Amino acid sequence: MNKTKLVSCFLSGRRKSISKYENQTEELQLNVLHKLICQAIHTEWGQTHGFAQVKDYDSFTKTSPVNTYEELKSYIDRMRHGEKDVLWSGQVRWYAKSSGTTNDKSKFIPVSKECLQDTHYRGGTDAVALYLGQNPRSRMFDGKALILGGSHSPNYNLPHSLVGDLSAILIENASPFVNYFRIPSKKVALLGDFEEKRERIAQAAIRENVTNLSGVPSWMLSVLTRVMDISGKTHLEDVWPGIEVFFHGGVAFTPYREQYRQLVTASDMHYMETYNASEGFFGLQNDLQDRSMLLMIDYGVFYEFIPMDEIDKENPQIVPLWGVETGKNYAMVISTSAGLWRYMIGDTVKFTQKDPYKFIITGRTKFFINAFGEELIVDNAENGLKAACEATGAQIREYTAAPVYMDAHGKCRHQWLIEFAKEPESLTDFAHILDLKLQEINSDYEAKRYKDITLQHLEIIPARKHLFDDWLKSKGKLGGQHKIPRLSNTRTYIDEMLSMNDSAKPEDF
């Protein structure tokens, strides 16, 4: 029996456990909540919010408020300075650095040892378990896993305490089993300079038998492009004949799918999406033919949801998982084994089915355009761009969009800044198809576009090569888990990028 079959047999029991998601949703989630309450009952937060008196879900909601990062920041700051038993039992030594809030450049998300084991690493194991269950002929453990990560640094110089990208924390604490199959070395994986890291990873990986990839699609594409440059090969399977799967997450895969299809032409190449955020591992594809992800309901995460049409109300409706409806857009609220209590993560999701609960990520609570009542979300944008690319043969590297509130002629429109990997023959046709698709899938956008009365036809501005990388670099955010803001209701991001785009030399285009 080969190594992959041995691993698959070992994980078969876990696949059976996941099958219980079909009829035990409420039971499993209430069990998670009970465990979280019990583990935090003697913490400062637990004592302040009466965890000793919490008997069920209703009593939990009455004693615990919904929180954003700003509400928990003072507690997290104290934890980062070494205080114990604040939001979670014991001392939390690791903090995932995430994109900031209105008031802060960065958020620092606590990652407890319990959160590492029962959420993040469990998610990685389950991704492998479900993939092998769908691909019994897999040979992924015949070779190595190319896993991309960010970097970390000491946390206030406290012993054994780190702050950095979640991926770096996962690599730092990885088991010997994972390290045996993983490349690059930990030293290279945790380098802070992404450009140096990319070069060293590519040089090392080209000599290995890589069978699987894990990382953010945009940064992985950058590394793989360098691998192809060094090797002189046409397709990735010419470098690594055993390549079979890419476990991806962090950003939507849709804009990159065609580029990966051209990079890896083998018909048996698979792509499996995971939803692993700094705050926890929440979902993964259990059917590679279905873009929806399975919500993982027996980890250290208790889920609640706020309908997006309630989000701005003083007392919005909040429902547990078993109270959601399919086809409705929700903001996700989580309570975790790292002390994030009823925490608004900032992501929005839409459920596609129940029992088991499957969903798609539709965007961010703060990444949308609703300047004129059009309520455009990231999922709309991704689907619109996909249609435009398919119709025109274009390929997209990166993009962002924002409203133009009123130009010199008193007209309002959406402005899209797009870096093409392959430009469409007609930018006008591309823009027209994108506009029509957005009207087809978003009735609010369609209404505002009616006869150009409220909203004019969208505008597309081609970005020079590497504009978005350069913008991230100017923010000290090149590489790792940093992402381009896809949609914004203000012009802050796009104006900065347009300024960099306008100052480019002709050869940059």
Put a short name on every predicted segment:
Residues 1-52, 60-67, 74-82, 169-509:
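Active-site glycine/GP-rich loop and adjacent strand/helix microenvironment
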Residues 130-176:
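Conserved AMP-binding loop of ANL adenylate-forming enzymes
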Residues 110, 114-120, 246-247, 278:
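Long, hydrophobic, well-ordered secondary-structure blocks that form the structural core
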Residues 123-128, 289:
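Short, basic alpha-helical nucleic acid-contact segments in DNA-binding proteins
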Residues 27, 31-95, 106-111, 118, ...:
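Active-site diphosphate/adenylate-binding microenvironment
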Residues 104-109, 368-371:
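Short small-residue beta-strand/loop micro-motif enriched in glycine and branched aliphatics
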Residues 96-102:
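Conserved helicase ATPase motor motifs in RecA-like P-loop NTPase domains
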Residues 92, 117, 121-122, 217-220, ...:
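Short alpha-helical patches at coil-to-helix transitions and adjacent helical residues
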